[in-house]
Amino acid sequence: MVTWKDAPTRTVDVDGIRFAYRELGCGSDVPVVFLHHLTAVLDDWDPKVIDGIAAHHRVIAFDNRGVGATGSSVPRTVEQMGTDAIAFIRALGLEKVDLFGFSLGGGVAQMVALQAPDLVRRMILAGTGPRGGGGIDQMTKIVGVAYAKAFISRKDPREFLFFPRTPEGKHAASDYLARLHERTRDRDKKFSLQARLAQLKAIVHAGKSDPDDLSVITAPVFVANGDRDLMVDSDHSADMARRLPNARLKIYPNSGHGGVFQHHETFLADALRFLANEGA
């Protein structure tokens, strides 16, 4: 079976814009569409997670507008990112999907569910929270501090943003970043500074927005986070889970924003049970 490191990059026309995506996994009636995080391109998905899901489901991951190999520019709002995601999904001829949104992607997934509820069967929202509050409007400062630490120490910013600076967290960060480089051919275009700034503005705008009425999202949702998330506090994730009428919550111990990657084996078991409607 094709794995993430070998999956070919394809494109599809979405209202005149070429969207880059990759697809793999076994055939299933409802594919799982992956929505990625701040400053991420296709190559930034953890192969352990994406291959683990693809062993049981058809998986589709894509670069949203203005990101990586996809054309145009990054939208000004997370809401518009959701609109673009809907357009991409429909351009593939899909009528029903499961969504896996990590971080910013979790916010985009919520917008998809709010704008096109009939399109979404189930959602996994990891390392994310709802619009409005939760310190999300401070994201520029949080990211800036991490980038400064990374520059001084010559490390990847995700070592500071995604994982706690404990021996266990540092080891998990090293393993995670190594996995991201398993793919050596047909790699995506690098994330541009312009796109990074645009995404940060959209996230800050979401943090300052009025809260959404999440009670209208009736699809089953699995909310996951680490107990030491610096970017989206686990309490904010828990608040989101409480406001979703059909949600379950799991907080992974001794982990941060990337808790689902640090605890990828446990998370995969939880996610697959959830997608199979067996609980999580």
Model-assigned labels for residue ranges:
Residues 60-100, 269:
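Active-site loop/oxyanion-hole signature of alpha/beta-hydrolase fold enzymes
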Residues 114, 121-153:
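Flexible "cap/lid" loop of the alpha/beta hydrolase fold
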Residues 15-71:
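Conserved HGGG/HGGXW glycine-rich cap/lid loop of the alpha/beta-hydrolase fold
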